[in-house]
Amino acid sequence: MKIMEPEIKIVNVVVSTKIGDNIDLEEVAMILENAEYEPEQFPGLVCRLSVPKVALLIFRSGKVNCTGAKSKEEAEIAIKKIIKELKDAGIDVIENPEIKIQNMVATADLGIEPNLDDIALMVEGTEYEPEQFPGLVYRLDDPKVVVLIFGSGKVVITGLKSEEDAKRALKKILDTIKEVQEL
């Protein structure tokens, strides 16, 4: 059985950073366009950008989470945009904060239809209950990620910290499927 090398597509990158201390979210809400701040519903300010298409959650502590980016670089662009707007408005912020990837989500198509029942029976670290969820859940230890494998051959990998991790995880999945389907 020949399996082609599937293309990995990064569909979401979540990063975090710290842009300052004790941020006045009411003031920030008036400065930033597309900012929503409803403290009775959520303790952070939500700012949605269209380019790049991301959502930023800004907290009073100065912590910022950026979600929806397709790469770390895209998230960095979004955070730099916000920092520039706040700095231009006279808010004291850290200009070049350290940006850390918290989670990446990738998808791929294996190009085959794996037998999920066989994989669930023969591979440790898997859960498959088709009455509850159509995908097989496969928890890898290295890289430490969760992989959802569907009968169509589509996979979703969560908990990634890098694209390299995505490649390593996909190789392990393919090797495992080859092994199971050869038995």
Curated annotation (Swiss-Prot):
It holds the Pfam family TBP. GO terms for biological process: DNA-templated transcription initiation. The keyword Transcription regulation applies. Sequence repeats lie at residues 10-86, 101-177. It comes from the Archaea. SUPFAM superfamilies: TATA-box binding protein-like. The keyword Nucleotide-binding does not apply. Keywords: DNA-binding, Repeat, Transcription, Transcription regulation. GO terms for molecular function: DNA binding; DNA-binding transcription factor activity; general transcription initiation factor activity. General factor that plays a role in the activation of archaeal genes transcribed by RNA polymerase. Binds specifically to the TATA box promoter element which lies close to the position of transcription initiation. PANTHER family: TATA-BOX BINDING PROTEIN. Belongs to the TBP family. This is TATA-box-binding protein. It comes from Methanocaldococcus jannaschii (strain ATCC 43067 / DSM 2661 / JAL-1 / JCM 10045 / NBRC 100440) (Methanococcus jannaschii).
